Amino acid sequence: MAEEGAQKATGKIKSVVLILSGKGGVGKSTVASQIALELANGGNKVGILDVDLCGPSIPRVLGLEDKDVHQCADGWIPVYADKNEKLAVMSIGFLLRNSKDAVVWRGPKKNAMIKQFLSDVVWGDLDYLIIDTPPGTSDEHITVAENVRGLNLTGAVMVTTPQAVALGDVRREITFCKKVGIPIVGIVENMSGYTCPNCSECTNIFSKGGGEALAQLTQVPFLGCLPLDPKLTMSIEDGKSFTELYSESPTALAIREIIRPLITS
C-alpha cells in the first residue's frame, strides 16, 4: 500500500538514484546537486529529494534557501530551481522556520518524515529522482531502501574522498547496499586533487586513486574523479550550474562522464 501511495502522489518516475557516502564532509550533496543540474540541462525532468534531515544542504547548494514549500490537495508542491521547471527540489530545509534551526528528532519521527517525503511530494512525471541521503548507514537509510522498492530504482552512487578513512566507510556502505538489495551504479572519488584556477593544472594534495582501487576490490564500477575546483565552489555559492558556466572545463567533462551510466541505464 505504501508503494502504491508513493506512485500515486509522485507521478511516474522513470529512474530513482540514491547518493550515498560512508561519512560526512566528502561532498555528497555537491555531487548530488551537480548530477541533478546536468541531467536537467540535458532536457530531462528531474527531482532532487534531500532526506538528510539533520544536515539539509541541498537548498544552500542550489541557491534556494529563501524558498517555501506549498501544499495542495495531493501533498507538497516542490520548489523549482529554474524557470522552465525542469528541476524540482524538496528538503526539510524548506519547512524550517529558520534555516539554521537544528532538527532534534528521534529515529521514528525521522523515518515518518522520510516516508512522507517519498509519498506526499507532487513531483509530476520525472525522468530522474535524485535522493541525497545522510552520511553513514542508519534507520533513515533502511527506511529509504524499504520505500523506494516500489519505484524504478536504478541504484546508488557512492561518494568518497581519496583518504583511507573515507574509503573504509564507503566499503561498509557497499556492504549495506548488498544486504538491503540496492544496486550500485558506481563510485565517485571527490576532492581528487586541486585544480589551479589560473592554469587548470591538477595537483594531488591528498592521496589519489583510492576510489578506483576500492571499486576494483569490491567489483563495483568506477565512475570517475572530481577535483577540488575553486570555480565549482563559486558556482555552488551562487546556486548556479557549473557545467553550464564552464562547459569545457575538465571538471565539467568529469561530471558528464559520471552521469553517463545513469543516462544509458
From Swiss-Prot:
It comes from the Eukaryota. The keyword Lipoprotein does not apply. GO terms for molecular function: 4 iron, 4 sulfur cluster binding; ATP binding; ATP-dependent FeS chaperone activity; iron-sulfur cluster binding; metal ion binding. Its main location: cytoplasm. One of its GO terms (biological process) is iron-sulfur cluster assembly. Transmembrane segments: none annotated. Pfam families: ParA (PF10609). Binds 4 [4Fe-4S] clusters per heterotetramer. Contains two stable clusters in the N-termini of NUBP1 and two labile, bridging clusters between subunits of the NUBP1-NUBP2 heterotetramer. It is found in: Cytoplasm. ATP binds at residues 22-29. [4Fe-4S] cluster binds at residues 196, 199. InterPro entries: Mrp-like_CS, Mrp/NBP35_ATP-bd, NUBP2/Cfd1_eukaryotes, P-loop_NTPase, YlxH/NBP35. Its cofactor is [4Fe-4S] cluster. Keywords: 4Fe-4S, ATP-binding, Cytoplasm, Iron, Iron-sulfur, Metal-binding, Nucleotide-binding. One of its GO terms (cellular component) is cytosol. Heterotetramer of 2 NUBP1 and 2 NUBP2 chains. Component of the cytosolic iron-sulfur (Fe/S) protein assembly (CIA) machinery. Required for maturation of extramitochondrial Fe-S proteins. The NUBP1-NUBP2 heterotetramer forms a Fe-S scaffold complex, mediating the de novo assembly of an Fe-S cluster and its transfer to target apoproteins. Belongs to the Mrp/NBP35 ATP-binding proteins family. NUBP2/CFD1 subfamily. This is Cytosolic Fe-S cluster assembly factor NUBP2 homolog.
